[in-house]
Amino acid sequence: YCYKFYWLEAIIQLISEGKTESTFDEIIDEMITNAWYSVREFHIHLSGMPLDGQIKDGLERAVLLLTELSELSANASKVEIKNAIKQYNKELKTTKEQLTHMVPYRALAGFFTRSNEKVNWNSANRMTAYIQKFNKEVLTLPYILGTSSKLKKEVYFQQDWIKMIQDHTVNILGWIQYEKVKWLQNNNPEVPGLVYKLTPTEEKVRKLKKVRDLWQDIMEVQEIRDVFTGQPMEGKYDIDHFIPWSFVMNDELWNLMPMDASLNSSKSNRLPKWNPFFQNFAQN
């Protein structure tokens, strides 16, 4: 499932912030905040969608449950999301615990080929002991686990790995994102431009002033009508996308148009109806 990528990403982020130890609870909170925008804004399924319509991915279920419990918007900040998780921690507890069953242990599986000892994946206590033994006798692992249970279980980052991760954080996170995008695109083939839908785009990158200036010059020489109302554009107006930005993920000129400011917010991210709006759009 996709949350293995979010598990690794959360650990790298915590280490880059100077953390030397954490807990399952803290790491999973970080995972929820990292997955929040994609799931909420674009309805991306982290591990595909089965025929029965049930959500397979535990991390996606956690995001959707927090959505039901809170009133947070899709572009809520990490601080806001973590505050909401804390507020509804009791209600989220069972869903969060499900994320601890396999991934924290399986994420280290690649290292265990160095040992001939058989790994018992069915017992958290035995896996914890095996990880500690392997780390001591065979090879230093990125992290080992403490003896507490469930969400309270400690995660101790190893010093040899901390320095390497801090020195190469950007490259490691870039690799994780690359692998994450490949996984998500395979599971969401109907979603275009998925690489641009993992985190909110900074508004300062999307400045539309020059587009507004161009439309203003056009309106000085010919009449432009609002695509949705058919009324001449006069007074206050917004510049917005005919096909919502969340679908095309760009600000190309062909898709930008003046629009009645009072209608812009109500249009939201819904696709406009082909008839009669496309004809109006083309005539402008």
Segments from the language model and where they lie:
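Mixed-charge, low-complexity interaction segments
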Residues: Y1-K207, V211, P276-N284
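Short cysteine-rich loop/turn motifs with clustered Cys
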Residues: K209-D238, D260
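Short, charged/polar micro-motifs that form catalytic or ligand-binding hotspots
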Residues: Y1, Q216-M219, S246-N250
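Histidine-centered nuclease catalytic patch
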Residues: G230-P258, K267-N280
